[in-house]
Amino acid sequence: MTTANCGAHDELDFKLVFGEDGAPTPVSQVSRPADLEPDDCASIYIFNVDPPPSTLNSSLGLPHHGLLQSHSSVLSPSFQLQGFKNYEGTDDISESKYSSLSGPKPFECPSIQITSISPNCHQETDAHEDDLHVNDPEREYLERPSRDHLYLPLEPSYRESSLSPSPASSVSSRSWFSDASSCESLSHIYDDVDSELNEAAARFTLGSPLTSPGGSPGGCPGEESWHQQYGPGHSLSPRQSPCHSPRSSITDENWLSPRPASGPSSRPTSPCGKRRHSSAEVCYAGSLSPHHSPVPSPGHSPRGSVTEDTWLTAPVHTGSGLSPAPFPFQYCVETDIPLKTRKTSDDQAAILPGKLEVCSDDQGSLSPSRETSVDDGLGSQYPLKKDSSGDQFLSVPSPFTWSKPKPGHTPIFRTSSLPPLDWPLPTHFGQCELKIEVQPKTHHRAHYETEGSRGAVKASTGGHPVVKLLGYSEKPINLQMFIGTADDRYLRPHAFYQVHRITGKTVATASQEIIIASTKVLEIPLLPENNMSASIDCAGILKLRNSDIELRKGETDIGRKNTRVRLVFRVHIPQPSGKVLSLQIASIPVECSQRSAQELPHIEKYSINSCSVNGGHEMIVTGSNFLPESKIIFLEKGQDGRPHWEAEGKIIREKCQGGHIVLEVPPYHNPAVTSAVQVHFYLCNGKRKKSQSQRFTYTPVLMKQEQREDTDLSSVPSLPVPHSAQTQRPSSDTGHPHDSALSAPRSLICPVQPAYASMITSTHLPQLQCRDEGAGKEQHIIPSSVMHQPFQVTPTSPMGSSYQSIQTNMYNGPTCLPMNPASSQEFDPVLFQQDAALSNLVNLGCQPLSPIPFHSSNSDATGHLLAHSPHSVQTPPHLQSMGYHCSSAGQRSLSSPVAAQVTGQPSSHLQPITYCPSHPGSATAASPAASHALSSSPISGPPSPQLQSMPYQSPSSGTASSPSPVTRMHSGQHSTQAQSTGQGGLSVPSSLVCHSLCDPASFPPGGAAVSIKPEPEDQEPNFATIGLQDITLDDVNEIIGRDMSQITVSQGPEVIRDAPLPGPESPDVMSSNSAQ
């Protein structure tokens, strides 16, 4: 294809090149506009050969591409092919002649189309041959496909996208091959280009190319239509030699040089304009690469080197500009792809519908292949390969789900469908329990497959771990063991470590390995003669290879630092039904890395595991590998496993020493939580040196429970507090509405608040326990929460008219009535309203109320008080108790008094307050049952005045009611404003609301807790004008104080504790009656 250097008027005769001597044959030339230079259109010369081989006919210049029918007229066949003339210092462009297909073709030669034409490889053309004649305009040059054209593809390893310039070492800003493609790009694979290039080189005398300064600012025929159809990105390309191979033309000097960027309409760096790409320039899809390559990559890059959205989202051209002739190459589906290349997207071919992957049977090197647009007709003939190689990629694993699986049902399974290894199972069920009697050591160095065994896992106390099954010893069963995870997520088989069977003379336990879901499981027999126990001296830990780790799906998000494991043991116990009971237990975390065991901190124990959301508590953490710069981080994770709250505990450095760290628990980020919140904390010595996370619980300080109409009290969960208030719903067939828990004419307040102030200094909750003898059972439900608010109690004087109203949230009706002996109203028996739980009390340094014993008798039975203040609590001081008993009409109730036990300095001389109303016709008598001592608050202070007993009898006609004494004790400072040392005058009312309901069947099945709200102290309601709903316990206390002011009985605490119960003829009762 090259010619010798000729003079200005010498012709380029190719007869010498091909050894032909035929006479020139008339050729037809394609007409073109006069303003267009032929050099712009004739950059590649295609030789069509047909016998007889006489002479070289002409050189054809295919504008744009061979299949585009852009010429509608042919030139006169009276011109022969003229050689290129060498013009120095001129910009005239030589003309090329177009041969017509009408004449015989004496010789055909395959054309070699490589890439855009280099300005250094062009020959000068003769510009003086301009006699063009139009002949046969309706005949087009491309009536039939040119079977002689070779389209040689690039091979996948031709160049790197980031290093190589254009494929033929072009300095152009664009090449036919997109820069978005990498060396693994799926490209056109054809026949071996080496043999073709060698064959072509043997036919031609390759000479030194000369640079043509010729150029034209204008375009070739069809340029504007080309721009309109295919966009400007394909119209401009620098000149490049058609004789250069992609393999041979890249030199050391230019293969790393970056190509200058140019816009779609920029001119080339050649001084004389830009030569058109012509037949080597073809169209795939009309999309542009990030570097404006006219020919983007035919397939997506497995490495995801696409850098611009326009390369992926450019419109796909149809085949309207293509000839209907078939393509002279074939497509194939299979290409070579690196087997371990990672694919960074699921289906990039799906977003590249216009990219065709064209290949041949033999894989060869690259040559610019013809771009093709896909239409419906061509798509079936040349199938579109979307992602046929997707299966050969190693897909990136999807993120591991952090959601915990639901167990579903009881751990009883069929033998044919045993639970998977990641299924959560309990440690005990029924009478069977699986337990680890001896835990393994916290460190065991795992071994690789390529090294020798490091022995079995050992125990911290020496020997090996011991596992025992309790509750079953009928026949031997297999104990399954595998290596599980030890992170914050639910237990599952570990991805990096497997159990390894240890054998040898020193191994006493038989075992065998099985594979369950690609996890090694060691089966160890549990024998009845060994008491269903086994020493695990046959199990080691095997570390998988890193490649195996990477291949395991779902574990790449953890990383290779997950070196802690647990030994998981599982048994399947046969059941009489033919099924099996599956139990599972996991050991403590075991560190498998030697380096991690030496560097990572380890928390062995900590002093407290819960505190209020306000924080501030001191916690002592004990462990190993603690450093002076160690930090303790509290965090809370969401359902996805990602932390959404972190806080650092304040370490008290002066108290830390060695393996002990003392810190202050940080407050929780949401102090308004209404239930306990579980968080985690860990100790870290650096960015990646963290200990295992430990659990910690924040408890709420304020929980206000309003009225809930459809909530049963028995379904309300208890709070995680040291003491819980316990009450019982009375058995009733019909529920009482909450909004009418008190009937206005039949309600009464059971007075508990004395006329003297009391300070409360503990933070425990009260206990309330009731027993329903008719139901014959005892229930403990719903604790009373504690309010984090101070309250002040002002004692009422006998003649004072000051009232403090403590409002309750659950009553819409009247809450109390004045208990005046002179009142003419008749009051029904007072029954305790169990649905009204204790009001929220003060948690800021408050003392818990002691249990409120209550006995409700629905049948003739002897009742006794059930609630006792626990004496084994950490904070012994409690508030006082109230013993109360009532009965319904026609029943006999025996109530026992509650004597308050003085547990500090002697404070007050108390007298029992006895009260036992009954219905008309009912006979009640006090029973001298054994009194239950309840500890009271030993608050230091001067003795408070004695509380005299006040027997009260319901003024109903024909009734004989005897009092049931209730003793109260208050030890505190007697002052108008009750104060305590270190409390600053904070106090709470020790009043409990009791409700009188005539019919036990009218009790509601569920109730709501009572929230006590602080009342302004300057409010003094007028007793004569307020309604029943505004009467509070203080009003009743004033009435009690007036009654008690008339009683002058004085007894000591010892007398109260040892004195017999007052009977119907007791002097106390008589004095009370006389006072009434």
From Swiss-Prot:
Residues 208-309 are annotated as: 3 X SP repeats. Residues 257-271, 713-722, 917-939, 946-965 have a biased composition (Low complexity). GO terms for molecular function: chromatin binding; DNA binding; DNA-binding transcription activator activity, RNA polymerase II-specific; DNA-binding transcription factor activity; DNA-binding transcription factor activity, RNA polymerase II-specific; DNA-binding transcription repressor activity, RNA polymerase II-specific; RNA polymerase II cis-regulatory region sequence-specific DNA binding; sequence-specific DNA binding. Keywords: Acetylation, Cytoplasm, DNA-binding, Nucleus, Phosphoprotein, Repeat, Transcription, Transcription regulation, Ubl conjugation. GO terms for cellular component: cytoplasm; cytosol; nucleus; transcription regulator complex. Residues 110-115 are annotated as: Calcineurin-binding. The modification Phosphoserine is found at residues 345, 373, 1066. The keyword Transmembrane does not apply. Expressed in cardiomyocytes (at protein level). Induction: Induced by lipopolysaccharides. It is found in: Cytoplasm; Nucleus. Residues 237-254, 362-371, 724-734, 888-911, 970-981 have a biased composition (Polar residues). PANTHER family: NFAT, NUCLEAR FACTOR OF ACTIVATED T-CELLS, CYTOPLASMIC 3. Rel Similarity Domain (RSD) allows DNA-binding and cooperative interactions with AP1 factors. This is Nuclear factor of activated T-cells, cytoplasmic 3.
